[in-house]
């Protein structure tokens, strides 16, 4: 009996040792767009720059997406918006369509009238609270997106500001009231991460992702 117990422990410890650690990937590791493309597959050129780890949308360049697809992941990033600016990070995408972590100047952009369009909201679906810990325009915010199975979370500066489960009755109700309602399976696709060009200057840095 002891012999089999020892064999079991050796097997279990061997599997534990062989387990691969979760890899965190820097989506701008080389300080360039080698991991990115435009939505239409073209090379990222005018409109977007990256320098010293800071990604800047400064003029018309179109949305850009990762070459790799993701579904279950944790994404952390810093973001900074211009005065009266609008942008976002989309995930579980198809083309330019997908769930969106809204990036907005809540004070001066006209989209602030809709609570689900304000900063850190799950755009069109779940509003971030008015009491969220957002920085002044021009300062860096820390964002975090968790997409694991049906669980969706948005974080802002260390505080969870959005939480919903895909496919629940609450989700279905919000989805049917949104502009996405005709897109079957929306929110449950595997797809690239997208940085949105919404015609306003925006900055990102420290964009790190790990599959979970």
Description of each model-found segment:
Residues 3-12:
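Sec-dependent N-terminal signal peptides
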Residues 17-212:
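Carbohydrate-interacting regions of secretory-pathway proteins
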């Amino acid at each position: 009996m002891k012999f089999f117990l020892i064999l079991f422990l050796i097997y279990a410890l061997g599997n534990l040792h062989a387990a691969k650690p979760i890899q965190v990937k820097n989506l701008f590791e080389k300080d360039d767009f080698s991991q990115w493309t435009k939505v239409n597959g073209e090379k990222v050129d005018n409109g977007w720059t990256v320098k010293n780890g800071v990604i800047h949308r400064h003029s018309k360049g179109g949305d850009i997406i990762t070459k790799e697809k993701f579904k279950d992941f944790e994404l952390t990033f810093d973001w900074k918006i211009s005065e009266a600016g609008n942008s976002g990070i989309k995930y579980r995408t198809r083309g330019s369509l997908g769930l969106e972590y809204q990036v907005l100047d809540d004070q001066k952009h006209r989209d602030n009238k809709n609570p689900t369009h304000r900063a850190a909201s799950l755009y069109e679906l779940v509003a971030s609270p008015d009491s969220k810990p957002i920085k002044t325009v021009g300062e860096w915010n820390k964002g975090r997106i968790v997409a694991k199975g049906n669980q969706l979370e948005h974080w802002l500066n260390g505080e969870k500001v959005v939480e919903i489960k895909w496919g629940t009755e609450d989700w279905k109700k919000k989805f049917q009231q949104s502009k996405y309602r005709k897109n079957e399976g929306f929110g449950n696709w595997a797809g690239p991460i997208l940085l949105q060009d919404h015609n306003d200057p925006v900055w990102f840095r420290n964009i790190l992702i790990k599959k979970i």
